[in-house]
UniProtKB/Swiss-Prot annotation:
Subcellular localization, as worded in the UniProt entry: Cell inner membrane
Primary gene name: atpD
GO molecular function: ATP binding; ATP hydrolysis activity; proton-transporting ATP synthase activity, rotational mechanism
Listed name of the protein: ATP synthase subunit beta
SMART domains found in the cross-reference section: AAA
Catalytically driven reaction(s): ATP + H2O + 4 H(+)(in) = ADP + phosphate + 5 H(+)(out)
Main location: membrane
Family to which this protein belongs: Belongs to the ATPase alpha/beta chains family.
Membrane topology label: Peripheral membrane protein
Record-listed ATP binding positions: 155-162
Coiled coil: none
Amino acid sequence: MSNGTIVQCIGAVVDIQFPRDNMPKIYEALTLVDEGSSFAEKGLTLEVQQQLGDGVVRTIALGSSDGLRRGMQVAGTGAPISVPVGHGTLGRIMDVLGRPIDEAGPIASDEKRAIHQPAPRFDELSPSVELLETGIKVIDLVCPFAKGGKVGLFGGAGVGKTVNMMELINNIAKQHSGLSVFAGVGERTREGNDFYHEMEESNVLDKVAMVFGQMNEPPGNRLRVALTGLTMAEKFRDEGRDILFFVDNIYRYTLAGTEVSALLGRMPSAVGYQPTLAEEMGVLQERITSTKTGSITSIQAVYVPADDLTDPSPATTFQHLDSTVVLSRDIAALGIYPAVDPLDSSSRQLDPQVVGEEHYQVARGVQQTLQRYKELRDIIAILGMDELSPEDKQAVARARKIQRFLSQPFHVAEVFTGSPGKYVSLAETIRGFKMIVDGECDALPEQAFYMVGTIDEAFEKAKKLQ
């Protein structure tokens, strides 16, 4: 481990000259040691990205590079970025380097782990088909989650990705006796603050480790913070536990990679993304997996730029997931929340051999009815309902009831809506939708199905409306 000298600074990219025979390795962490620098107290860390030859390495600063100048001294650590792991991280908020940012003293952990780890070998993997009940009707019905699976919440700006994720945390993490890790990647600090207080009020803070690299931080932090959170989750998994791993937002991880790639001088590819997009996504996603010792169930929010699902970033994320929950602006505009599109959302678990014949038939019946309504919408807009055949009129009436019954009051939105949140079991969800599809609710007004939990509540509401 030798010392080097800064020779160039361009934003977050810093070039450092080392002796030719003692250059640091790729991904090695370097620290600023310049005595006259205010950064020395803060301990600015840099990560080696490229070896340019002649003893010069190109690094990314994991922190603000304001005030850096040529000639400053940098020391090699001889190892990649390592973060504390284990039980000492629970109930704490950390940054990308595993340093506490909650003003609650040092992290009580004896073990540190490098954030760059190989993915588990093929023979260590353990696929699972056990269902994970979420208590959210539309998700449990049309895109059920698997324990140890990977789930993506796709949506544009302001359609409810974070609220849906918070509700899933509320319903799963609180019922689930295991541990959770939350990685806030390039999102709003306010949301991280809300999340912390929510966990504190629910008395589950001692089961959650939180890692944040928020919007205002340099791209190096946002690029590596997902790996920091994942390293903590992997430690719990390797101890034989079932872990929930929440990431908000995977798109910001890609975006940080784009910023870093441009600063490193790589030629951009489609839509200006980095040429290594698929590889960077694979490096992260291949590690989020379940092994024979324990499982990681991952729920990831994915921002969709300009509501375009064919954009390279969401498109690259799709191929790694078991369940995709697509949030639609059109459904949100109707006032139906959660704004999940039941026709666009899908899951590998929606198979009669996994969920059972009844669940499969009800889910497909719901989708067929909604698809028929979608096809008839243009005719209704031009000619009106009167021109439809009796069968089509019935399909439209049922579809509108289904659409409203897919809405549900959330626990985490109680403070905004004033309606108490509802948790609906899978059996109740299937029973309710089966009754609508089979025509047992044809006499009820469609308003009775809006923002209720079970089908029994819809019958109660219908009595009040009459």
